[in-house]
UniProtKB/Swiss-Prot annotation:
Binding site for NADP(+): 48, 54
Protein name stated in the entry: Chorismate synthase
Native source organism of the sequence: Acidovorax ebreus (strain TPSY) (Diaphorobacter sp. (strain TPSY))
Cellular-component GO terms for this entry: cytosol
PANTHER family named among the record's database cross-references: CHORISMATE SYNTHASE
Alphabetized SUPFAM superfamilies for the sequence: Chorismate synthase, AroC
S-S bridge residues: none
Pathway per the UniProt entry: Metabolic intermediate biosynthesis; chorismate biosynthesis; chorismate from D-erythrose 4-phosphate and phosphoenolpyruvate: step 7/7
Keyword NADP part of the UniProt annotation: yes
Length: 366
């Protein structure tokens, strides 16, 4: 299986399966000399961890990260950093009834046809469990970018199923299980309680933002910053759409309003989402993700088995009724990995470029 590594200079290779003994990643290309400990990584893993509310999977994994290599006396050495997360709460017996059939909307069918076999336990390699190493690697990238450029990452949910979530303030996001930017989440609690009782699932929309991104990241024509962002975001489980800046809303805009006016005091707007011509402008990078409903649900559905015969599928086990609820820290990590890789590439090629005129300020829209 190929496709398990992302990045050019900051390379991350992800390994493991949902019900295997462990999952993890190897980071190659991290600059030496950065202070790094397990605690630096664990904070983000705890934000993504399962079993933290009644609205997510009740699989109880501590997701304790172990640094196996690449750090000596508390600092990165420049050699590959191996990160390991042990699986401790697998319940493989829950998947015996679907080992010979395919879940509608799941990767089961495609994996079986491509590889000739599949691991049905928790989805195997296609499980969202494999986003934990991504978050771990993203924490390393976040730390370096914060120390080098002051870059910060944050994400929130802007829609849960049919319910839009109005933006109030980023300060609310850490204080509710939905990563919602609102003070009152009772409507979303009630919605998820009813959804879970019905045996169904729902999708979500996620907004992710990077601030204080340096100007000049991105490599035209085919390694554009926004192209790479879209590429890795589509690699996140259940993502079916990616928008940069105004995204699909730009279809209904006129050129007089879509173009972000430049003034000596700064940009007037940020419809471009911080990227022009595939290169960062110094504005906030703004990305939105459309996440489909979870395919593993307890409601019976029509499918076929591995012999091509009709069957009814009921998925037991512990699943997220909305995978979007835990997607915010994962989206942050993926965005950080792309920006980290492009920052190192920019430094390698254009590190000596100096402009007489400083970049203009970014507009701050919340």
């Amino acid at each position: 299986m190929s496709g398990n590594t992302l990045g050019t200079l900051f390379c991350v290779t992800n390994f493991g399966e949902s019900h295997g003994p462990a999952i993890g990643c190897v980071i190659d290309g991290c600059p030496p000399g950065m202070e790094l400990s397990e605690a630096d990584i664990q904070a983000d893993l705890d934000r993504r961890r399962p079993g933290t509310s009644r609205h997510v999977t009740q699989r109880n994994e501590p997701d304790a990260v172990e640094i196996l290599s690449g750090v000596y006396e508390g600092k990165t050495t420049g050699t590959p950093i191996a990160l390991l997360i042990r699986n401790t709460d697998q319940r493989s017996k829950d998947y015996g009834n679907i080992a010979q059939s395919f879940r509608p909307g799941h990767a089961d069918y495609a994996y079986w046809h491509k590889y000739g076999l599949r691991d049905p336990r928790g989805g195997g390699r296609s499980s969202a469990r494999l986003t934990a190493p991504t978050v771990a690697a993203g924490a390393v990238a976040k730390k370096w970018l914060a120390e080098k450029y002051g870059t910060r990452f944050r994400a929130c949910m802007t829609q849960l199923g049919e319910l839009p979530i109005p933006f109030e303030n980023w300060e609310h996001v850490p204080h509710n299980p939905f990563f919602a930017p609102v003070a009152d989440v009772q409507a979303y609690e009630d919605y998820m309680d009813a959804l879970r009782k019905s045996g169904d699932s729902c999708g979500a929309r996620i907004r992710v933002q990077a601030t204080s991104v340096p100007v000049g990241l991105g490599e035209p024509l085919y390694d554009k910053l926004d192209a790479d962002i879209a590429h890795v975001m589509m690699g996140l489980n259940a993502v079916k759409g990616v928008e940069i800046g105004a995204g699909f809303a730009s279809v209904a805009q006129r050129g007089t309003t879509h173009g972000d006016s430049l003034t000596p005091t700064g940009f007037a707007s940020n419809n471009a989402g911080g990227v022009l011509g595939g290169i960062s402008t110094g504005q906030d990078i703004e990305v939105s993700l459309a996440i489909k409903p979870t395919s593993s649900i307890i409601s019976p559905r029509e499918s076929i088995d591995i012999h091509g015969q009709s069957t009814e599928v009921i998925t037991k086990g512990r699943h997220d009724p909305c995978v979007g609820i835990r997607a915010a820290p994962i989206a942050e990590a993926l965005l950080a990995l792309v920006i980290m890789d492009h920052a190192l590439r920019h430094r390698a090629q254009c590190g000596d470029v100096v402009q007489a005129v400083a970049p203009i300020p970014a507009v701050r829209l919340g």
